[in-house]
């Protein structure tokens, strides 16, 4: 079987959970399942994938979404040799949809997020958000199968697109590379970025987007125990408005307490692993999260997780067993921030409890989110469609 896998992100250009998912799915399909996988991605050339330019020179000032659609058309023209197409995120969904119609082959879409659940994307894409929403809807309604990365995501798919037959939606969770993500005893990276190894710290790793809830974390940080350090490994903000808001909150937090460390450049995975390994807790204050691979990464490093109880997070983080969950309501964000701080302070007061949560987290991550078994489920789905 030859799989045509369509994606925007592909190593080394991986910046989110969907890219991590694609990376490990392709590895396991090729190396474990022995399948032929033709990867079509966007951006610079890669040795093991066909790369398509993200910019169309015919309209250099056009909305970013138009450039994506132009790339999708080029992708669709080159996937006729596949037996099945599998697209990831709206960036590649149209390529899969057009390719399936053009070449008469089945199309599987993986739902890593849903545009109707992310209205703040309009702030970033402008009118392009209406295009991305149209692309996703069109591809999902026509797809032969939809893979949801959590049960929560499956429910969201059926709510957003009730025309989809429930039998076409299949839950296959994201996985974790437990061989790579493990507790790192070294502290050289931790110390090099300014963390005091003699004081506890909590860590956030992720993009600064509306989805990730960083402003909530920063406001909650005003109530954290004064001895705990706050470490943010956070990339650039999605929009100038969000950057200004985040910068103001960081400045206010740094003015109120010491030990607030912000690392804006992307660190190597090995460095992130070490920071996760020595944290008292990993913080995930997302307001929307279909699964949250980074929670699995923290758990595999034996670190407790304090996270919002949204989307697929409760399927990963067992409340009171591998971490602590905080209810989130968009109508009462002040309460969320207060309870987030309370859960962090609970672990500061009882580091032994935090250690037990972290140890149980690795057991759960390894036992339930193994990539080999999840890739096998994906292969079984492919075969059922041929």
Predicted regions span which residues?
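Short hydrophobic beta-strand element within catalytic cores of glycosyltransferases
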Residues: 304-307, 317
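Carbohydrate-associated surface elements
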Residues: 152, 175
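Glycosyltransferase donor-sugar binding loop
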Residues: 43-45, 176, 229-248, 261
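Nucleotide-activated donor-binding/catalytic signature segment of Leloir-type glycosyltransferases, i.e.
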Residues: 243-270
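Short His-centered aromatic/hydrophobic patch
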Residues: 87-92, 111
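Aromatic "clamp/platform" in nucleotide-sugar-dependent glycosyltransferases that forms part
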Residues: 287
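A short helix/loop element that forms part of the nucleotide-sugar donor recognition site in Leloir-type
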Residues: 182-195
């Amino acid at each position: 079987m030859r799989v045509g896998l369509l994606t925007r992100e592909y190593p080394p250009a991986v910046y989110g959970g969907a890219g991590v998912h694609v990376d490990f799915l392709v590895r396991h399909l090729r190396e474990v399942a022995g399948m032929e996988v033709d990867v079509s991605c966007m951006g610079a050339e890669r040795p093991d994938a066909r790369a398509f330019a993200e910019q169309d020179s015919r309209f250099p000032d056009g909305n970013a979404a138009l450039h994506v659609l132009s790339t999708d058309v080029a992708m669709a023209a080159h996937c006729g040799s596949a037996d099945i197409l599998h697209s990831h995120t709206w960036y590649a969904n149209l390529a899969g949809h057009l390719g399936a119609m053009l070449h008469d082959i089945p199309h599987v879409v993986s739902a890593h997020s849903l545009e109707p659940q992310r209205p703040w994307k309009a702030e970033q894409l402008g009118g392009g958000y209406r295009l991305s929403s149209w692309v996703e809807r069109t591809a999902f309604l026509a797809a032969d199968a939809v893979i949801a990365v959590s049960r929560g995501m499956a429910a969201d798919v059926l709510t957003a697109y009730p025309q989809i037959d429930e039998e076409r939606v299949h839950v296959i969770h994201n996985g974790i590379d437990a061989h790579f993500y493990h507790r790192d005893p070294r502290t050289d990276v931790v110390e090099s970025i300014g963390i005091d190894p003699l004081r506890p710290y909590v860590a956030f790793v992720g993009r600064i987007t509306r989805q990730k809830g960083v402003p909530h974390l920063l406001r909650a940080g005003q109530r954290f125990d004064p001895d705990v350090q706050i470490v943010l490994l956070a990339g650039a903000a999605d929009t100038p408005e969000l950057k200004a808001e985040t910068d103001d909150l960081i400045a206010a937090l740094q003015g109120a307490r010491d030990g607030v460390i912000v690392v804006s450049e992307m660190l190597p995975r090995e460095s992130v692993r070490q920071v996760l390994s020595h944290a008292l807790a990993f913080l995930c204050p997302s307001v929307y999260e279909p699964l949250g691979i980074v929670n699995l990464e923290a758990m595999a490093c034996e670190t407790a997780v304090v996270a919002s109880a949204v989307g697929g997070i409760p399927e990963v983080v067992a409340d009171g067993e591998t971490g602590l969950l905080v209810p989130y309501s968009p109508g009462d964000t002040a309460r969320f921030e207060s309870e987030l701080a309370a859960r962090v302070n609970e672990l500061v007061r009882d580091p032994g409890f935090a250690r037990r949560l972290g140890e149980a987290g690795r057991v759960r991550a390894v036992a339930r989110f193994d990539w080999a078994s999840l890739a096998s489920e994906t292969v079984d789905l492919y075969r059922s469609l041929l």
